[in-house]
Amino acid sequence: TLEQTLGLIDAIGPDGLGLLVDSYHLDTTSTDAAALLPLGDALIVHAHINDAGSETTAETALDGNRVLPGAGRLPLQHYVDVLKAIGYSGFLCCEVLTPTPLGPTPTDAANNIRESLRKLGV
């Protein structure tokens, strides 16, 4: 969980450590993205954005059942807004783990990902 990870960083010390935040795993641990607000940008070194299928819940979500950002049930606009509010300027990695191709070609898949992120203002 976010709380456990922050406790570990606090115990070890932040030198050389950073936090990778992930929209999917925030959901599976029932953590609102607003919990990131007090952290600021310095601690967050990388961010993943992905969505969960609409038929899943936080309790039933599996890694292989992700969909394009904005195509599922996660409050991704809120997640993006929080990252912007804390001044996060690093990479935002789209991590769509699914057995279903995101497009007929790799170029189409990349374009579909780009369009889904643009709709979220990324």
Placement of each model-derived feature along the sequence:
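Histidine-acidic metal/acid-base catalytic patches
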Residues: 2-21, 25-122
